[in-house]
């Protein structure tokens, strides 16, 4: 028999409710985790506005959820254009 679904309450503070703007994401990894640095790039400098560290299994689930949500978005609002690669002035490496 399937277990009943449990409701989970999630708290979010006032600062997190504001959100963080990012126009660039830098991804790096170790054997055990992937690190996503969300960056607000205003040349000549970028600022990491948020860092998310995940294990590979959770990141794979996140990718699936992002793909499903993008498909739903495009169904409702039409196709999106992929952002162009940054020019030389936009490099953070």
Predicted regions, residues:
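Positively charged, low-complexity terminal tracts
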Residues: 1-93
């Amino acid at each position: 028999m399937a277990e009943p679904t449990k409701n989970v309450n999630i708290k979010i503070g006032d600062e997190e409710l504001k959100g963080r703007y990012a126009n660039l994401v830098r991804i790096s990894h170790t054997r055990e985790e992937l690190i996503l640095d969300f960056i607000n790039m205003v040349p000549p400098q970028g600022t990491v506005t948020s860092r998310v560290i995940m294990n590979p299994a959770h990141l794979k689930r996140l990718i699936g959820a992002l793909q499903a949500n993008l498909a739903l978005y495009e169904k409702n609002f039409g196709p999106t254009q992929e952002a162009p690669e940054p020019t030389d002035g936009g490099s953070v490496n």
